[in-house]
Each structure stands twice: as C-alpha cells, then as structure tokens.
Amino acid sequence: NSYDKAIFSYGFIQFTGAAAVGGSLNRLLASMETNAPAAFQNIFKRVGIDTEGVGKNAVVTVLDDNGFKRSGDEAWLYIQRNVALYGAFIQAGFEPSLVREQLRMANELYVQPALNFKLDVTIGGIRLTVPRISDVFTSEAALTIIIALAINQGVGGMSKTLAPAVSTVATQQRLNSVTALRQIDERRVFENIVATATDERVINRVNSVFNSGLSFA
C-alpha cells in the first residue's frame, strides 16, 4: 500500500517506509533480514531489495534498473513506482518466518511502548502520574483501542488523546489517586474521546472496537 507521507506501507498494521513518519518498515525489513535471513534472501534480496544498519538506523535499499543502489526514502519511492516489486511483499505475507517478524516488531514498536507509557492526568486541579497505562486500563477493548491509537497517532499522540478523557471521567467519578483510577469506567473514557475528538481516524478506530463486541469488563 502507498498513502499520505508514508510513501509505501506494508503489513497487518501498515508499517511505514518514509523517515518523516518513523520509517518503521525499514526496521521491520532489517529485523526480517536478521532473524529470518534465508527467507529474506529468497524473497527480497532476489529482487534487489536489501537493508543497511540496525534498529533506528536501519534503512532499506533497492537496486534500480541501472544497477544503482537507492536507499531510504529514495528506495521507497522507487519501490512504490515499480509494481513488479510488490510481489516480494505479497510473497512475504505467506512466509511464516517473515510474518513472525511483523508480530515481533509490532510488539516492540507499538504494543509495549503504548502499554508501558507514563500518563499524566489532572483531576480536580491535582496532577497525577500513572506509571504505566496498563496499570489503569486492563480490558481487552480498552487495550485494543490504546494500541490502535498508538499505531495510528504514535504513542505520544495516543497519550494526548487519552489523558484529557481520563481526566474528565475521573473527575466525574471522583477518583483522585492513581490507585483509585483503577476503578475508572473504561468505556466512558473512550465514549468521551468519540464525543470530543476532531480526527476522524481516532473516532473510527474507537467506534470499530465498540462495534466489535470486545469487552470493557
């Protein structure tokens, strides 16, 4: 897939290629090459797609029709414009060892950072710091929304959306300590987000969980 500023995106959570939006797809492919080298060689290197560097410094490279190596955003632009290269990504979606790397990187880049993020809220003029979001939110529905927002908005963007809703509902419920926040009505928090958010992407992600049947209990 290719959209917005991402240049090129791929995978079940749409890892993004462009550096401007985090370049998570670079890290995914680097993880694939490190942890599943044979499959990466057979599927990606075979068509000229490779990686350089590791972790946050990882970049994807590709050999163009003239044998010139493009890297980073230039590589993603070239891949985006050459539909024949899409086949490698489609094939990777059916290779278990490479699918496993999607799960690994989704957990590393989004799930754990979101659930372990420190949340600052203000209740009745008192500022409280929740050490980890997962100390307060425990239901399958709430955690699904939090992770979905972190993927779409970034962990910082997710927290900026979540904090005022927590503050509002906690004030209404008179929950004035971190321990008391564990009794918060999780569904009401996200109903507040739907009622106050201006970003349709946020609203749609919350509503999709509301409509999924996942439990807030």
Residue ranges, per PLM feature:
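Cell-wall polysaccharide-cleaving catalytic domain and substrate-binding groove, primarily
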Residues: 1-217
